From Swiss-Prot:
Occurrences of domain Globin (ranges): 3-147
Protein's organism: Panthera tigris sumatrae
Protein task: Involved in oxygen transport from the lung to the various peripheral tissues.
Binding site for heme b: H64, H93
Name of the encoding gene: HBB1
InterPro entries: Globin, Globin-like_sf, Globin/Proto, Hemoglobin_b, Hemoglobin_oxygen_transport
Keywords in alphabetical order: Acetylation, Heme, Iron, Metal-binding, Methylation, Oxygen transport, Phosphoprotein, Transport
Identification of the protein by name: Hemoglobin subunit beta-1
GO process terms (BP): hydrogen peroxide catabolic process
Tissue and organ expression note: Red blood cells.
């Protein structure tokens, strides 16, 4: 049984089909690093993260944000099995990278804010509610290995 109704899946897939993954991915990861600066410790090899402007214009941040959102897109294709879809990434982030799983929730919330900014009135309360469920589900799936 899915955690999203058929209507919610339609809302998520409808909006996601319009998302520019390159742009939104870089912006979401950049905003995470600006708003939650302690997350920068996982990206020390990315070069200059000394200011909001440096972070938001950093090519490595943008490239990794794109990679993150491409994985998110793949997860949306397997929305009814997020734990399976993100099992390998959960293992990587837990066992090798030692990322605090709370960061997955933070990134999900930042992504929702970025989507709201990009889509304005189209990102109505129903769409937001559906995306909040999705990012919570993805965060839970990514944290699964930690349990």
């Amino acid at each position: 049984m899915s955690f999203l109704s058929a209507e919610e899946k339609g809302l998520v897939n409808g909006l996601w089909s319009k998302v520019n993954v390159d742009e939104v991915g870089g912006e979401a990861l950049g905003r995470l690093l600006v708003v939650y600066p302690w997350t920068q410790r996982f990206f020390q090899s990315f070069g200059d993260l000394s200011s909001a402007d440096a972070i938001m214009s950093n090519a490595k941040v943008k490239a990794h944000g794109k990679k993150v959102l491409n994985s998110f897109s793949d997860g949306l294709k397997n929305i009814d099995d997020l734990k399976g879809a993100f099992a390998k990434l959960s293992e990587l982030h837990c066992d090798k990278l030692h990322v605090d799983p709370e960061n997955f929730r933070l990134l999900g919330n930042v992504l929702v804010c970025v989507l709201a900014h990009h889509f304005g009135h189209e990102f109505n309360p129903q769409v937001q509610a559906a995306f909040q469920k999705v990012v919570a589900g993805v965060a839970s799936a990514l944290a699964h290995r930690y349990h």
